[in-house]
Amino acid sequence: MKIEYNPDLLEQTDETDYSKIAKDCFIDVDETIDMQPIALSLGKHEHKGQMYDTPIASYGDFFCLIGASKSRKTYAKKGIISSYIGGNASSYFPDLKGHGNKDKVIIDNDTEQSKFHAQRGARQILNMVGSKYPYYKPYEMRSLNYKDRIGLIKWQLENIDNIGLMFIDGIADLVRNVNDLDECNDLVQMLMSWSKDYNIAIGTILHINYGGIKATGHLGSAVTKKAETVVLVETTEGITSLKANLTRNISFNDIEFEVGTDGLPKQNSLISSDKNY
């Protein structure tokens, strides 16, 4: 069978050093390769009589929060970011914990909210921490088009040193069409490359289809397939749960939180019993 090649692809391969790529991609089965360092954990698990932190996110990878509209995904993000920073955040989410985070920069990109609401959310994060954290950098991207949002993120990565955690709330605003397969795959490839090349943890947020738990569009499918962890955010009668929807790691225990009269989310309890592995 004759295979027709795209001439544009042939032109690209002429300038590509595949011997170097092959060397970089080769897996030596005799080499000791350490596990990716944990960036965020939720609770602990037992393994062979010892307790270990249960990872949600690792440096060099990306994770995703999914949920229905107004299900408090952004509140969950606030709990995660404040817990990554530390300080008094353990009083709000005692089972969420940041790792390797000393003096790390946190980039908090919001594509949906107005500057007023984005600022209010950023202040709530610092209220949970208990002090102004100089390395927390929130950005409001609502007025930008999707290309400029991607451009700004690239600028952040290239010009801001020592980033540990980056959030993109919401990732669907970085594409023109969430059902364009090529465009969505390209964006997910960016997430994988950014997280690896800069050795950071990237958190994303996506909506789910009405009446189900599947993330919206081709973008949702691509993100959930490649993400290290997918966390489902659900709210019923004022109580919000974070559930391990998909993960390459050990499944963490689900947790619940409520939003207090002060506007801050606070964990209620572990829903699940401790898991043993």
Which residues make up each language-model segment?
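C-terminal regions of RecA-like/P-loop NTPase motor modules
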Residues: 1-20, 32, 36, 40-42, ...
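Conserved, well-folded catalytic cores of nucleic-acid-processing
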Residues: 83, 87, 125-128, 174-177, ...
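Conserved catalytic network of the ASCE P-loop NTPase/AAA+ motor domain
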Residues: 57, 97-102, 129-131, 158-160, ...
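Phosphate-binding/switch region of NTP-binding enzymes
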Residues: 64-66, 70, 74-75, 185-273
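Conserved inter-motif catalytic segment of the P-loop NTP-binding fold
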Residues: 99-182, 262-264, 271-275
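The Walker A/P-loop phosphate-binding site
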Residues: 10-118, 123-125
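Alpha-helical scaffold elements adjacent to nucleotide-binding pockets in ATP/GTP-utilizing enzyme cores
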Residues: 79-80, 117-125, 152, 186-190, ...
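Short, solvent-exposed loop/turn segments at secondary-structure junctions
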Residues: 58, 174-178, 208-215
